[in-house]
């Protein structure tokens, strides 16, 4: 095993302190809150459009919260791996939201949101219903996730580096 592998193993085996856990938990909760705000906006859109969100879509949408929930679990258990799960959560969730709403989802499971925001702004026919309208609130609550996730990722990576350097310095 190389020195860097031993250092990484030591790092991953070390519990984070309360202050560090609190710091990255705030960022993780900010990512979750941004995702929740975005999903709340979908409810607002559905009401505005008189669109009934199918039950299976509610269930499938829970997948968005898997990574932030895993991050929260790891943070609460003071695991040093929580730094990177917060980073992963921010990147994956932001990328997925942007892909679905600016381009097209990979699978057609998102109901009316199988159409991107540009098409929805012009109007689309979906299951016999004409749906039109994307406003500034929709755009703001789409972009809130990357706006929160980018600083969350940077802060988590920076804190990880500081924590690891401190650990390795104290261990020598």
Language-model features: locations:
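Canonical alpha-helical transmembrane segments
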Residues: 63-82
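Cytosolic juxtamembrane helix and N-cap/initiation of the first transmembrane helix
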Residues: 2-32, 158-161
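C-terminal TM-helix exit segments that contain a strictly Trp-centered aromatic cap at the helix terminus
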Residues: 34-42, 91-114
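Interfacial segments of alpha-helical transmembrane regions
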Residues: 17-29, 79-93
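Hydrophobic alpha-helical transmembrane segments
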Residues: 64-67, 125-150
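Cytosolic juxtamembrane helix at the C-terminal end of the final transmembrane segment
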Residues: 150-171
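Transmembrane alpha-helix entry/boundary detector in multi-pass membrane proteins
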Residues: 38, 43-66
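Membrane-interfacial helical/loop segments at transmembrane boundaries in membrane proteins
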Residues: 109-129
């Amino acid at each position: 095993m190389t020195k860097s592998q031993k250092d990484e193993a030591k790092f991953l085996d070390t519990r984070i302190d309360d202050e560090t856990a609190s710091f990255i938990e705030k960022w993780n909760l900010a990512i979750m809150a941004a995702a929740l705000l975005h999903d709340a906006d979908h409810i607002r859109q559905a009401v505005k459009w008189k669109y009934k969100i199918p039950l299976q879509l509610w269930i499938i949408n829970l997948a968005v919260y898997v990574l932030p929930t895993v991050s929260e679990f790891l943070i609460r258990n003071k695991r040093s791996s929580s730094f990177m799960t917060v980073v992963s959560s921010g990147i994956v969730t932001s990328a997925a939201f942007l892909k679905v709403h600016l381009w097209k989802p990979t699978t057609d499971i998102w109901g009316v949101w199988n159409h991107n925001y540009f098409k929805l702004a012009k109007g689309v026919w979906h299951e016999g219903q004409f749906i039109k309208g994307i406003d500034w609130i929709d755009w703001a609550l789409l972009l809130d996730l990357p706006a929160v996730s980018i600083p969350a990722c940077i802060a988590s990576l920076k804190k990880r580096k500081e924590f690891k350097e401190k650990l390795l310095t104290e261990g020598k």
